[in-house]
A protein has these predicted regions:
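C-terminal cap/loop subdomain of S1 sulfatases and analogous C-terminal strand-loop tails that border
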Residues: 7-14, 18-96, 124-139
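Basic, alpha-helical interaction scaffolds
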Residues: 119
Length: 139
């Protein structure tokens, strides 16, 4: 939810369906702060993107997937695809463009996509230091 009458140029009650994550806040705030504000070079690079295009009703141009791990859930969101695993169970795949409520698991129909997304998730988990918690099921 965002409220900024002077900076958000969309119709009243506009809802953006663009996925975003906490990692997008710093790039967004830095862009809003304007020129002269730069991210410190001694810190790790930012994975997020600025959300400001959504303030004008535009789509985001996200190149990297979004990764989450919380409360025993492992999640990768890549465009319309969402790969989900709960507490070491089998991975589930959903097409959010067609199934926003995640009722139709498509993992059996798209095994190659599932394998590719699991590899991406495991690579991310190892990179950030949670590699020992990665799933063996479905890989």
């Amino acid at each position: 939810i965002a409220h900024w009458p002077a900076g958000i140029n969309v119709s009243k009650n506009f809802i953006s369906r663009e996925p975003c994550h906490l990692i997008d806040f710093v790039p967004t705030f830095m862009e809003l702060a304007g020129e002269g504000v730069s991210y410190p070079k001694y810190l790790p690079s930012l994975d997020g993107i600025s959300l400001t295009p959504t303030f004008a009703g535009k789509k985001l141009e996200r190149e990297k997937p979004l990764f989450f791990q919380y409360g025993g859930w492992n999640v990768l969101r890549q465009n319309q695809w969402k790969l989900v695993q709960r507490k070491q169970e089998n991975w589930q795949l959903y097409n959010l463009d067609r199934d926003r409520t995640e009722t139709s698991n498509l993992a059996d129909q798209f095994p190659d996509r599932v394998k590719q997304m699991i590899r991406a998730w495991q690579s991310w988990a190892t990179e950030i230091g949670i590699g020992n918690e990665k799933s063996k099921k479905g890989s």
